[in-house]
UniProtKB/Swiss-Prot annotation:
Protein name: AA10 family lytic polysaccharide monooxygenase CBP21
InterPro entries hit by this protein: Cellulose/chitin-bd_N, GlcNAc_Chitin_IntDeg, Ig_E-set
Location of this chain's protein in the cell: Secreted
Taxonomic source organism: Serratia marcescens
Domain Chitin-binding type-4, first and last residues per copy: 28-193
Major subcellular location class: secreted
Length: 197
């Protein structure tokens, strides 16, 4: 094989590898409505957010929550150090959206579609402490809403109808999780809400 052929072959392999990486890297999404903590950073309703304001679709970490996945204290950032600001937790740190308990729509915007295992929604316990970092102990560990996709490729916009538990009121965090079927990862979106009946 001559030098030109080797160079062309190397460039071809490099291009294929980069295409594969870019395809995986583009498989992202965020909760558009009610706007997640990360998306509200992009909208500048949340401030001092760091780099997540430019890429709310990239809050991605290991799947398997609550048995695996992000470490306690790093759940909102999906354990991604570049988005550490999302893990800051005080009663007044994040803009809260007013929602009512009962039926609500949750809409994901996918910047690229990806084979999906499930979509799951967790909520903080009635007695959670809003002044402490989010941990598994903060949440009911059984999702209040779940949709299984069995590996299907979703549309670019996905809306789920979910019933927020009636025994919640006031400040809460809803954790929306998009579990990817063909990678070890999931996308995590914290949604800050103020609930009433």
């Amino acid at each position: 094989m001559n030098k030109t052929s080797r160079t062309l072959l190397s460039l071809g392999l490099l291009s294929a590898a980069m295409f594969g990486v870019s395809q995986q890297a583009n498989a992202h999404g965020y909760v558009e409505s009610p706007a997640s903590r990360a998306y509200q950073c992009k909208l500048q309703l949340n401030t001092q957010c760091g780099s997540v304001q430019y890429e709310p679709q990239s809050v991605e970490g290991l799947k398997g929550f609550p048995q695996a996945g992000p470490a306690d204290g790093h759940i909102a950032s999906a354990d991604k150090s570049t988005f550490f600001e999302l893990d800051q937790q005080t009663p007044t740190r994040w803009n809260k959206l007013n929602l009512k308990t009962g039926p609500n729509s949750f809409t994901w915007k996918l910047t690229a579609r990806h084979s999906t295992t499930s979509w799951r929604y967790f909520i903080t316990k009635p007695n959670w402490d809003a002044s402490q970092p989010l941990t598994r102990a903060s949440f009911d560990l059984t999702p209040f809403c779940q949709f299984n996709d069995g590996g299907a490729i979703p549309a670019a916009q996905v809306t789920h109808q979910c019933n927020i538990p009636a025994d919640r009121s006031g400040s809460h965090v809803i954790l929306a999780v998009w579990d990817i079927a063909d990678t070890a990862n999931a996308f995590y979106q914290a949604i800050d809400v103020n609930l009433s009946k």
